[in-house]
Every structure is written in C-alpha cells, then in structure tokens.
C-alpha cells in the first residue's frame, strides 16, 4: 500500500491496515539518532549544578540619600506602588535570575551527556526517554491529497499555494463579544491585503529585509495583526508582537533592546494608548497606522524569499505565571517544523472510522475555534500558520464568549467546528455555566439545537492535567450536547511556557515506536489513560502506581489521580533527568523533563526586564562552550514529571516545588530525607477543603540553610467595602481569618505533612498577576519578589513557629548563656592555644620619672596656665578658624588669663559659686566654654560640661540637662549669649519650667558669661587665690557627661591628677615636641574633645585652634584648609563628625596635606560601625588623602585614650569574623569565599600607651584565652580613675596568681584581642584590640549572645518604609519586642513575615512581638541618636502611641479577651485613637 494514498480523505482507511508497511521503517529513526549522538563526545564528569530555584536572602545597603516611602501628601514618589521589577535595590533580594546565564555552559554539557547516555542505553536499564517519532510518509495537503507540502520551504510559499488552491475559502473569522461575525477573510483577500501592507512598508516606510518592527494591536484587531505579520514576511522583516496590555516600560525596553525604529498599529489603538503618552514623544520610534494603508496606491514590491535560518519573529513573554521574562527567537525552520509536525498529528485523527459521525462543511473542511489571540505564540502557530499549512478555517473569539452561557456551544454548532483550543480557565467558565443552568444553552436561540458531534479534538492548553475536570467536560458537557466518544475528544495540550508557549505534546493517532503489535497499540491508546499514584511516593520523587482494583486499600488523600498528555509530537524526544546528578532517571523516578525538538525557538538570555543592573546577557545557543547546533541539543523545559508507557505525566513547575527535609531513624542513625511537594496540588486541596479560599500560591524560602514554606491565599471575605470596625456582616473578621488559617494549616499537616512557617491572607484578586495565553494567573515569581521586598497586599498573617522551629539550629532548651560555667568549659575544650588575652605597654616606652609623677600628683592645670602666662604673655593662646576670616588670633596667654580672672570675679560676685559646688556649663561657643571651665577650676567649683551642638535643637536637650542638674544638685547654669536667647524663647522656657516641675526640682538660675567686662583688679585677686586641696588626687575636679551612640549617658568624675595624666599621655604619644597648634572645639564636653579643647593646649603650651562643629559638618573642606594654613601634623575628630565632614568635603591640596599631616585620630567610644568606616575610606580616596593618615583610637568614658593604631591604617586593621562563632562567644576569622557575608570588624588599637588591657570573663573573672570573647578591663598607670560611686564606673580587683593583684577597671564593653600579621615587620604578629558592644546592648537568647545594634541595622534594611535608625529591639519578661518607626501606614501585614524571616536567617533570633509607630514618634537627640531609655519607658508605661502590633508566637497571648483583638492589619487607613489600638503595651505585661 502506498503511504501517500493513506491521506486520501475520500477513502476510509484504518491506521492498523498500514502498520506493517510503516513498522519496518521505525527502527531507522532510533539508529539515526544514535549515529548523530556518537558524533558528540560523552563527558563522564559528575554533573551537579545549583539549578534549584529556592529563595536566597541577601542583605544589601540602600542608598543613603534616596527618599523612599515618605508620608502622605509628600512631593516625593511612593515607591511601594511601583512595579515589583523597578523596586530600587530590595534588601532581601531574589537572586535566582543572575545565575541563569552562568548555568548555560553547564546545561549544554548536560545536553551533550544526555545524547551519549541515550545512544548507549540498553533495554535492561529501563531509562525514561523517548526516541523521536518520524512520519515515514509524505505530508500532503488535506484539501489536496495529491500535493506534498514538504516542497514548500517558507511560510509565504505556503500562503501563495493556499491562495491559488482555495482562493475563496474562508481563512479567518473574528467573533465579537456577542458572538457576531465581525471580520471574515478569504485566503485571496489575506494575501492581497498583505501585499498592500508590504507595498507601503517598502516604498513609503522604507523598510529593508532584516529590519525589526513592532506590531502593536489589540485583541479586537486580530485580522489587522494577521495581515501585518504576513506583510512583514513578504519583505523579510522581523516581527516583534506587543500588546497594549503590556506596560510602557516593556515597550521602551523592546525599543532599546532591539533598536526598533518603526511600529505598526491602528488608528484607534494609537489614539487610545499612544497619542497622549510619553512613548509617542520618542523621536526614535515612528508609528504607522496599518488600517490606512488601503488609501495608498499599490506599487510593485520586491519580495524576499526567507531562508531556513532567517529570523521571523521575536517574542517577548513578560512575566509568565511561573517564569521570568523570556525572549524567544523564531526562525523559518522553527515554524515549518511546527506546522509539519502538528499537521501530521492532527490529520491522523480516525474521525472517519465507523461509529464516528461528521457533518459536511465546505467539502469536509476543518474548522478551529479558539480564544487565543494570534499575537500569542500558541494562537499564532495553531490559528494562523498551521491554518495556512493544513488549510482549515480559524475562528478567533473573544474571552467574553466563553463567559456567556450557551454562546460557545452555539458557535461550535453553527460553524461545525472540528477543533477547539481553549485553556482551563476559559473552558471552566462555559462548563460550569452549563451545569448551573442547562436551559440557557439548550434554548440559546429559537429553532436551534446545540450539536457538538463535529468536534474531533477539544484541546486544552495547560502544564498540569486536571483529570477531574476532564471527566466533567466529557461527561457533563460534551456528551450531553451530542459528542460521540467524548472521552477521546478532550485533549490536554502541553505548552512549554518557558519557551513562550510552544506545544510539545497532545493526543494523536500516529503509530508509536514502542507498539510493536496491534493489540498493544489498542490497549495503550484506546483505554483510560488515568493512573493512580501513591502520594507518599511522589513526595520522595518516586512513582508507585496503584492498581485500580486495590483502590479500597487507600484513603482518597493517599492516592493521586493523574492523567497524561500524550507522546511527544513527531520529531521530538523527551528525557527525564535527575535534578542533582543530571543522569537520565530510571523507570519509577521523578525528574526534570528535558525536550529535544526542532520546534523549540532559540532562547536568548532570560530576565531582560528584571536585570536593571545591566549584566552581560548570555546567548543560550551562541555560547562558545556549546559546540553543537541547537537542533542537536536537549533543553530544560522547567517542568518535573515522569514517563509511563512513554506518555508524559507532569507534576508541576520546578520553580513551584516545595522541598521539605524530615529527620528519621534509619538503622539507629538519624538520617535526613528530602520530600517534595507541588504547589498546584497543595493549593487545589486547600481550595477544596476550605471554601473561603479563592486562589493562592505557595513557595519556599531558605533561612539559615533550612527550607521553609510560605502560603499566600486569597479570600473573598476580605474586601475593603466589607471591612468596617474589624467586623464582617455581624461576624468577627478576626475569628473568621483565624478559622481559615487553622483550616488551611490543618490541610497541609494532615494531607501533605508539610510544615508551614506562615500563612498570609490577601483580599480577593489582589496578588500580583500576569497575563499569559489570554488569562490572568497569579505570578509566582512576582509573589516571591513582593514577599521578599515586603510589598505583598496581604491583610492578615499568622505564624506557625511550633512546627517550623525544629528545622532551625536554634536550641530553645538552652537557657544558659555564653557566660555560664558549661559554656566556659566548652570553650576551653575547643581552644587548643593557652594564650592569655592581654596587651602590655611597649617595652620602648619610657617610664614616668619620679619628678614627673610628683608634678602630676601635686599640681593642677592652673599652675601650667600661670607659668605660660608669665613666660610668654604675648604668644597666641587661642585661635579661631572659619570659612570667612580663616585663622584669627583671639587671645594671647596674658589676655586669656585676664579673661579667666574677670570671669572668676563675676562668678564670685554674681553667681556666688562656692567650692565643691556643681555648675552646669551649657555652651555653644567653645571659646566661652574654655574660659568658663578654667574659672571653675580656680574657684574649686566642679564643672559639668554640656555642649549644645545646634541652637535650633536646644528644645530636645532640655530634658537631658535638666535630669543631670537634678542628679548632681546643680546650683547654677552658665550659658553663652546664643543659648540664653534660645532659653528665653516662650516655647523653650515653658518646656524648661514644666520639665523641672515634672522632676520635682527647683529650676537652677541661669547666668550669661558672654561679654563680661575685663577687670585688671581681677587678675591681682586671681594670683591671691590658692586652690588649697584641689590637687588632692581623690577630689573631683570635673564631671564629664559621655553620650554613647546607643543613646546612653555615662557621667564620669575626674581629679586634677587624672586630667594631667591624660594630658601627659597626649603630649608624649600624640603631640611630641611640636609647637604646632592643636584643633579643639569640635567636641568639647567629654573625652578627647574636652582634653584637646580645654586642657591639652595649656599643658603643652601650644595654641588651641577652635573650630565649631556646625561649621565643620556643613563644610568639610574647612578642616583641610585649617591643616594647610597652620601646618598641623595631628588632628583629633570624632567618628560621626569625621564621616559628615569628609562627605561634604569637595577636595583638598593633597600634596601639601599628605606631606604635612601625620595622622587624623578618630576616637570611638563604641564598636566602629563598618558602614561608617567604609564611607570614610571611600571619601579619603575621593579627596586624595593618603589612606594611612586616618587612624582609629579606642576611647572609654573612664579613659579618653586607651589605645590607638599608631603604625597602621584602618584598612589594615579590618577582618571578617564568623557571625555564629561571635554569638557563641568564640572568635574565628573567615577566609573562604563567603567571608564577605560575615561581620566586618575594624581594630581599635595596637598601642596601649601606659595602659594594660585584659579580656576578662565577666562572671568568673579570669583572663580569657585567645579565641574567646570577654569584657575589656583596663589598668591605668597614672591613677586615671576616681572614687567608686553610683555615678561612676568603679574599680574592681582582679585576683590572678600571675598578676600581683593589680587594680583593673571594668569598661562594661565586650571585645577580644586578635593577632594580625604585619608584612613590614618580618611577619610579626601584632595584637589588635577589637571592641564589640556594651553588655547592656546585648541579648542572651537560646544560649547565644546577640548584638542589638546588628539586629536593628539588619531589620532597617528589610523595607524602605522603615525609617533610618528607626528600630528598637529589647527583651522583657521573656519576650523579644521590636518597635519600628515607619514613613507611611501601609502593608504592615506584608512586612511581618520578612521581618521575622530576616531576624531568623541573619541572627538566629525569634521575634515575639512587632509594633509599628509613625515617623517622629521616637525621642531623639539633636544629633539623631535614639533616646532608648526614654522610649522604653514610654512603651512600658503605655504612653507610646503606635499604629498596630503583631504577636508572632501565639503562646504569648494572655487571655481570651485579648485574642479577640489580635493581629490584624488591613490596607485601609488606621485610626490613631487609643480605643483602636490593637495591642496595648500594658496588656503584654512585658516588664
């Protein structure tokens, strides 16, 4: 029998009659493939790639100057409303896309290995792969069986043949929403219109072959799109279809990426979507209206015959439901292969056999009805190109047709459609409408009876087959409406969405290469295709099929009913590959589905849209490591499934799988087993058992190397129109949401045994969706990105920590901290080196002589002032520097002494200050402060310096200095003129009086010292004053108020001998014998700033150059101008001021500065913040300053200058340490590739001056070994510390045999000593002191010691809505609470999961309560530091007004009444009244 005569449709020849003729030729197909595969070299390397698509959390710094998420009515843009792809630098970032291009060379090797494995496979191995089926017969024209379609080599040739053969036959029909025929074209009309389009495009637009154009048409303009695409094919123009539903950003990206200069559209579309937009203003893009081309005179065109490898179409799929943005390139060969293979499958339908009935319609012409627009790849292939090739008519209907009851059945009956192509979403609308009201279909029109007997195939586009719905369609819609063999008619069609929607498998009746006998073919192809699989085996990635007779042995939830697609289309092969090893899976295993076919388009690098950084994109096929052509390569489809009887079974998308690891005992060993779930089945079960759920999505995130599942569900009960006072039509909304989440969690536990971290409830149809194949589906990738960026529009969130916590490494049962005896014993066992952490003064440092020691103990700073005034009275003592007057001599030594004497006289007469009394110095001008403090020293008055940094922020300082005045019983307050004017203002004065009343104290008197007249008589009286006992070592001469960065205030008392000892250290180790001025006035209330401003210049006899802090912060170049003009060698500047001034500096004379300047000393009271230090280093490089000029120093309230980096720069003192080890109390330097993810610490000093430093265990009080963390203890050589009292850090004896009971002072700060190698000193190890946080700024949880500052900084980066420095974390009564200050009141519920996940992933800490407060609620100092103690006092007292609160651990709810007011936050506006506060601080009973 001739194979050509088989396709003669006038004969009713059965397929099995020609089986013997064809079966002999099947073996050559496999041999040909093996021959091709032997040409490829097999690689025996074990392939293992990180192709998993789980979420990775990465922490990134946001831009400091970026204005994001402001309050409402702001002129700035609210970036939370931007598309998810354009969110600037999300902190927790989904980083899968960056790896796609990097994996392509490896994927090419995997493809090569698959060919080698298939070519060498034997039948005994039972591997899951298929050999391509090849039709060993001519593919003839169904309308003309004597003509072979294989002779046509391009699409235009096919169109010309179809026009010549069937010119008047209907080609395409467009149906509107009401079912009326809008447009109908014949083949002749289509070609004529296409030539008219090509004539205008070539002669008027000037397009040449290879030019890329955009076709911009709406759904209702399908006919115009078809004509345009054929017109472009006539000229060899590359088509890029875009829909007006795409965003303008997508259009701009395509224009820029493809360098498009011309776009075709219609007049209506241009007027609606383009005319008044910014896209129209782009001069590089010209818009042409194709519906006006009929007005142009037709001119002859020069037709271009496209070759096989010429590009025909470039399809951008923007954010399909499961994949990122892709770019598929179609060639002529690709489309011809698709048309030939699809036609060879469709025409083998045995509809003309006995028992099948078919009406005649235009000489048995086939008709396809579909709702897929031709701009979609599937609609273009099946509805346009394959329609031309096979000669059938295509009816394009609107989506509303499927929603109208009875309309689809009417159209199928009217046009006698033989094929239909829909998706599940559209077909469900029609079927369910028929189930609810059959009369609307049966009596849709008078004298009309629905008859679907003409349907041969009802094709349904999907990735996962729904067997339950297939039965409903066949038994309850097709069969009642006249379809015979309805179960055979319903045909799922597998389209690879990763490749833009290319069909790769659907039902056909071609002979399978595996069916060697007639009865085997009939058994495999005509019986029911559904199989029953044990769900437990699928979870273990195995396939265990249950016979239908054994179904009673299992419960319904233990068995999964699955339906296949079919064999791969002709000329295609499928292999199931192991996800880890990349080997072909054996029968009974689940793996990745890899496809080999000429029908697949050429993929360019994916995620072009989501690649804003502009990384180099890799061409999948043009990669140099891919040594074979595309048609010889397997491609990863992104699906997971298996083969059974050579048919494809798909479980779901690889990106949508949810992994779970369970620990089980196997042979007395604890083993971890991997289980895999698929979100498709998970959401389907939840929707089945929880009727309140409309739709949802499930995905996984990775926290601390553990995988957690997150469910985001949509419920119609949450609507803004229904929410009113948290009530839903008489029912409590919260109770309803609790019921939904508990039911959903119960489903995941009972059926899937899946532990869920959190369940989020979103309003109806509010989750991010993407339009794909004509439907709106939830976009999993967008939901992941929105979840990680905290932008999901959820209204309720609930955590299930009890089920999720066992996966983490957190030991909840370990109540002992790192300072316990057991922990100390464990540390000693781990650390092998028995080296004590101790830093001694360098041996070359000279000891203090007895004369010098006697001088320090029996004299004061007043003696040095008198001596200097007597010897060099005309030498400059005080200099000032500003941007206008530059350097200016304010006072000489004689004039300075005279000013001090006049000030003393004023204090005696007006202030009436007595010796040993306390006076608060409240100054903004450093010169006036300098005079006042020396006047206090002369009178024996104890001064308490308090610097006013900004006059405008004085009102924020009132509470602080008022509390200090009460604590020390201050008798008077001395101020300068600017401070006095500010204090006399009505608001500040009333606030000061009210604060004194609240503190139950009498307001101290205020005296202005600016402009005191100079009196020569006062100098004579000053010489008669004898300080008396001021030089006594145990008497207090000064009280320093130290403000730490965390907001803490530490007052410290010093004697004159202590102050002189500090000055001596500065003179010997910093200034030396130089006579150059020293800079002061920047920070003059405490620490080294106080020494350099008020004392060091007098002690060393050098001038003091005063620079105001405000001037320096506003103009950082002022510092370098002062250094250059005065030839300064060493400068002291605090860390925060250094960062601000360096950032504002425009530049400097780097040559002069580097030659003159020796070092800029930056004292740090706390751990140097790495971000600030890095910023300083970057500014140093920008300015041109030598990097070794800036050096860090360790300061403490009890010792302003403990140690410093005398010989090394900041860059050499840094290192990365293991964060987990630091929390455990150990020190471990990370040297691997992951070191950049660990904390970066900068060393605080190597030179200890005259001090001895030890790292001491704070509980056991022994010196720690190297490798441990402990408390920093200091021993001073010069009696630098005062008496021990309640207001001062005290002294404590450290008893150790190796130490002769030396007196050490506790700093209260944690740290360690680590040895670094120095290349310039013969690799000698130098001890470096690294400081951590103060003990009161740490949390001990679950046996770990956490830094509050690190946790707060990490959580601040979670979302831009959180204010800078807007987090406060504290622990009270066993609960960990975090307060967040936010810009705007929106999407709080979406922030909760990512905040909790971030804390758990980065710091292994579990938050118990999260509360949000509006911006401006936190009390702050003028410098911006949070007043932590005052904020906590407001919270515990119930005075802190907050928006809403969320409890994470449900066991912290106190009573039933409290549960009813629990954690619900909606996207509506919040009421700030006390009655509507959801969680009150007093109810938590935290303190």
UniProtKB/Swiss-Prot annotation:
<keyword id="KW-0469">Meiosis</keyword>
<dbReference type="InterPro" id="IPR042099">
    <property type="entry name" value="ANL_N_sf"/>
</dbReference>
<comment type="function">
    <text>Has a role in meiosis.</text>
</comment>
<dbReference type="GO" id="GO:0044732">
    <property type="term" value="C:mitotic spindle pole body"/>
</dbReference>
<dbReference type="InterPro" id="IPR045851">
    <property type="entry name" value="AMP-bd_C_sf"/>
</dbReference>
<dbReference type="GO" id="GO:0051321">
    <property type="term" value="P:meiotic cell cycle"/>
</dbReference>
<dbReference type="InterPro" id="IPR037337">
    <property type="entry name" value="Dip2-like_dom"/>
</dbReference>
<dbReference type="InterPro" id="IPR025110">
    <property type="entry name" value="AMP-bd_C"/>
</dbReference>
<dbReference type="InterPro" id="IPR056881">
    <property type="entry name" value="Mug62_dom"/>
</dbReference>
<dbReference type="Pfam" id="PF23024">
    <property type="entry name" value="AMP-dom_DIP2-like"/>
</dbReference>
<keyword id="KW-0963">Cytoplasm</keyword>
<dbReference type="GO" id="GO:0003824">
    <property type="term" value="F:catalytic activity"/>
</dbReference>
<dbReference type="GO" id="GO:0005739">
    <property type="term" value="C:mitochondrion"/>
</dbReference>
<dbReference type="Pfam" id="PF00501">
    <property type="entry name" value="AMP-binding"/>
</dbReference>
<protein>
    <recommendedName>
        <fullName>Meiotically up-regulated gene 62 protein</fullName>
    </recommendedName>
</protein>
<dbReference type="GO" id="GO:0005829">
    <property type="term" value="C:cytosol"/>
</dbReference>
<dbReference type="Pfam" id="PF24919">
    <property type="entry name" value="Mug62"/>
</dbReference>
<dbReference type="GO" id="GO:0005737">
    <property type="term" value="C:cytoplasm"/>
</dbReference>
<keyword id="KW-0206">Cytoskeleton</keyword>
<dbReference type="GO" id="GO:0006085">
    <property type="term" value="P:acetyl-CoA biosynthetic process"/>
</dbReference>
<dbReference type="InterPro" id="IPR000873">
    <property type="entry name" value="AMP-dep_synth/lig_dom"/>
</dbReference>
């Amino acid at each position: 029998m001739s194979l050509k005569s088989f396709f003669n449709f006038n004969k009713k020849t059965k397929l099995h009659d020609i089986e013997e003729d064809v079966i002999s030729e099947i073996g050559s197909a496999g041999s040909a493939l093996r021959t091709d595969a032997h040409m490829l070299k097999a690689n025996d390397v074990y392939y293992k790639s990180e192709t998993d698509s789980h979420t990775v959390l990465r922490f990134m710094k946001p831009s400091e100057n970026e204005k994001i998420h402001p309050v409402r009515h702001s002129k700035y843009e609210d970036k939370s409303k931007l598309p998810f792809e354009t969110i600037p630098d999300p902190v927790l970032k989904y980083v899968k896309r960056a790896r796609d291009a990097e994996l392509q060379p490896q994927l090419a090797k995997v493809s090569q290995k698959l060919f080698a494995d298939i070519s060498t496979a034997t039948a005994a191995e039972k591997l899951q792969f298929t050999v391509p089926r090849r039709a060993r017969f001519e593919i003839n024209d169904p309308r003309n069986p004597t003509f072979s379609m294989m002779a046509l080599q391009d699409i235009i040739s096919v169109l010309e043949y179809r026009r010549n053969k069937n010119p008047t036959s209907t080609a395409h029909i467009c149906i509107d929403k009401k079912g009326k025929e809008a447009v109908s074209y014949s083949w002749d009309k289509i070609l004529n219109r296409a030539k008219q389009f090509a004539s205008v495009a070539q002669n008027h637009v000037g397009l040449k072959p290879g030019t890329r154009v955009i076709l911009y048409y709406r759904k209702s303009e399908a006919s115009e799109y078809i004509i345009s695409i054929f017109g472009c094919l006539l000229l060899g123009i590359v088509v890029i279809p875009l829909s007006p539903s795409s965003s303008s950003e997508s259009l701009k990206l395509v224009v820029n990426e493809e360098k498009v200069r011309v776009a075709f559209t219609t007049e209506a579309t241009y007027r609606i979507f383009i005319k008044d937009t910014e896209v129209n203003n782009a001069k590089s893009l010209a818009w042409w209206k194709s519906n006006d081309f009929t007005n142009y005179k037709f001119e002859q065109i020069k037709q271009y015959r496209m070759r096989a490898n010429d590009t025909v179409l470039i399809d951008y799929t923007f954010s399909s439901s499961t994949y990122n943005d892709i770019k598929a390139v179609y060639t002529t060969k690709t489309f011809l292969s698709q048309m030939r293979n699809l036609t060879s499958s469709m025409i083998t339908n045995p509809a003309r056999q006995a028992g099948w009935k078919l009406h005649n319609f235009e000489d048995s012409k086939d008709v396809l009805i579909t709702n897929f627009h031709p701009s979609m790849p599937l609609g273009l292939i099946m509805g346009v190109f394959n329609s031309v090739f096979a000669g059938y008519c295509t009816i394009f209907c609107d989506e509303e047709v499927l929603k109208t009851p009875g309309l689809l059945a009417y159209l199928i009956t009217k046009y006698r459609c033989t094929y239909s192509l829909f998706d599940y979403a559209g077909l469900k609308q029609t079927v369910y409408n028929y189930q609810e009201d059959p009369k609307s279909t049966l009596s849709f029109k008078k004298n009309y009876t629905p008859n679907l007997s003409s349907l041969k195939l009802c094709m349904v586009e999907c990735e996962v087959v729904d067997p339950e719905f297939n039965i409903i369609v066949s038994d309850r819609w097709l069969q009642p409406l006249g379809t015979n063999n309805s179960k055979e008619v319903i045909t799922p069609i597998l389209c690879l969405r990763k490749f833009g929607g290319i069909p790769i498998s659907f039902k056909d009746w071609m002979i399978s290469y595996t069916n060697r006998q007639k009865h085997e073919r009939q058994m495999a192809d005509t019986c029911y295709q559904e199989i029953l699989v044990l769900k437990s085996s699928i979870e273990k990635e195995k396939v265990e099929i249950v016979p239908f007779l054994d179904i009673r042995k299992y419960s319904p939830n233990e068995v999964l009913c699955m339906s296949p697609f079919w064999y791969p289309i002709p000329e295609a092969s499928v292999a199931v590959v192991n996800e880890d090893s990349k080997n072909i899976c054996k029968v009974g295993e689940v793996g990745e589905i890899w496809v080999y076919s000429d029908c697949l388009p050429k993929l360019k690098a994916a995620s072009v849209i989501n690649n804003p950084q502009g990384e180099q994109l890799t061409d999948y096929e043009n990669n140099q490591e891919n040594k074979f052509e595309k048609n010889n390569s397997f491609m990863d489809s992104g699906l997971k499934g298996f083969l059974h009887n050579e048919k494809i079974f798909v479980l779901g998308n690889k990106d949508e799988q949810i992994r779970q690891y369970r620990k089980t005992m196997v042979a007395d060993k604890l083993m971890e087993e991997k289980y895999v779930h698929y979100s498709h089945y998970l959401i389907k079960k939840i929707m089945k058992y929880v009727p309140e759920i409309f739709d949802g999505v499930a995905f996984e995130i990775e926290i601390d190397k553990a995988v957690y599942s997150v469910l985001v569900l949509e419920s119609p009960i949450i609507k803004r129109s229904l929410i009113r006072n948290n009530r839903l039509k008489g029912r409590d909304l919260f109770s309803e949401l609790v019921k939904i989440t508990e039911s959903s969690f119960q489903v995941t536990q009972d059926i899937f045994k899946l532990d869920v971290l959190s369940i989020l409830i979103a309003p109806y149809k509010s989750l991010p969706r993407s339009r794909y194949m004509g439907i709106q589906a939830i976009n999993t990738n967008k939901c992941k990105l929105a979840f990680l960026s905290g932008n999901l529009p959820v209204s309720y969130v609930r955590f299930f920590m009890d089920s999720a916590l066992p996966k983490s490494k957190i030991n909840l049962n370990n109540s002992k901290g790192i300072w316990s005896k057991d922990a100390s014993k464990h540390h000693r066992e781990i650390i092998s080196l028995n080296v004590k952490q101790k830093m001694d003064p360098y041996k070359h440092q000279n000891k203090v002589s007895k004369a010098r020691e006697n001088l320090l103990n029996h004299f004061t700073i007043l003696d040095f002032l008198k001596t200097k005034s007597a010897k060099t009275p005309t030498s400059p003592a005080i200099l000032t520097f500003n941007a206008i007057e530059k350097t200016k001599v304010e006072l000489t030594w004689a004039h300075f002494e005279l000013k001090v004497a006049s000030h003393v006289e004023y204090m005696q007469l007006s202030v009436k200050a007595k010796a040993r009394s306390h006076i608060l110095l409240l100054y903004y001008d450093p010169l006036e402060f300098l005079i006042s403090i020396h006047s206090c020293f002369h009178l024996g008055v104890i001064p308490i310096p308090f610097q006013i940094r900004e006059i405008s922020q004085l009102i924020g300082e009132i509470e602080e200095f008022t509390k200090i005045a009460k604590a020390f019983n201050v008798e008077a307050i001395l101020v300068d003129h600017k401070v006095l004017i500010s204090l006399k203002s009505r608001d500040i004065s009333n606030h000061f009086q009210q604060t004194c009343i609240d503190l139950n104290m009498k307001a101290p008197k205020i005296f202005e010292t600016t402009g005191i007249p100079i009196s020569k008589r006062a100098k004579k009286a000053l010489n008669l004053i004898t300080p008396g006992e001021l030089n006594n070592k145990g008497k207090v001469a000064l009280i320093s108020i130290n403000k730490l960065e965390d907001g803490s205030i530490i007052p410290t008392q010093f004697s004159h001998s202590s102050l002189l000892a500090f000055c001596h250290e500065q003179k010997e180790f910093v200034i030396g014998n130089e006579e150059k001025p020293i800079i002061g006035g920047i920070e003059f209330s405490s620490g080294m700033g106080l020494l350099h401003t008020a004392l060091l210049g007098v002690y060393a006899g050098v001038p003091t150059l005063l620079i105001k802090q405000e001037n320096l912060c506003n103009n950082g170049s002022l510092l370098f101008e002062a250094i250059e003009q005065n030839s300064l060698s060493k400068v002291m500047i605090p860390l925060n001021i250094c960062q601000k001034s360096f950032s504002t500096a425009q530049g400097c004379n780097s040559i002069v500065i580097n030659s003159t300047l020796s070092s800029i000393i930056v004292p740090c009271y706390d751990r140097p913040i790495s971000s600030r230090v890095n910023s300083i280093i970057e500014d140093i490089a920008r300015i041109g300053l030598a990097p070794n000029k800036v050096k860090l120093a360790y300061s403490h309230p009890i010792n302003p200058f403990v140690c410093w980096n005398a010989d090394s720069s900041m860059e050499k003192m840094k290192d990365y340490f293991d964060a987990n080890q630091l929390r455990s109390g150990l020190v471990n330097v990370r040297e691997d590739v992951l070191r950049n993810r660990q904390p970066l610490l900068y060393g605080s000093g190597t030179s200890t001056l005259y001090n001895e430093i030890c790292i001491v265990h704070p509980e056991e009080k022994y010196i720690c070994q190297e490798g441990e963390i402990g408390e920093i203890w200091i021993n001073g050589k010069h009696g630098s510390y005062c008496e021990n009292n309640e207001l001062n850090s005290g002294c404590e004896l450290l008893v150790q045999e190796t130490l002769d009971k030396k007196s050490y002072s506790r700093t209260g700060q944690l740290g360690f000593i680590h040895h670094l190698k120095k290349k310039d000193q013969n690799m000698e190890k130098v001890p470096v002191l690294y400081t951590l946080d103060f003990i009161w700024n740490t949390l001990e949880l679950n046996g770990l010691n956490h830094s509050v500052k690190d946790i707060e900084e990490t959580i601040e980066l979670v979302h831009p809505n959180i204010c800078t420095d807007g987090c406060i974390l504290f622990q009270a009564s066993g609960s960990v609470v975090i307060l967040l200050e936010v810009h705007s009141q929106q999407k709080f519920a979406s922030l909760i999961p990512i905040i909790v996940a971030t804390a758990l992933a980065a710091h292994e800490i579990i938050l118990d309560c999260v509360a949000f407060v509006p911006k401006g609620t936190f009390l702050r100092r003028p410098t911006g530091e949070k007043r932590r103690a005052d904020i906590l006092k407001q919270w515990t007292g119930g005075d802190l007004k907050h928006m809403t609160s969320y409890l994470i651990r449900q066991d912290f709810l106190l009573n039933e009444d409290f549960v009813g007011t629990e954690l619900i936050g909606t996207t509506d506006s919040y009421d700030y009244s006390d009655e509507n506060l959801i969680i009150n601080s007093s109810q938590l009973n935290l303190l």
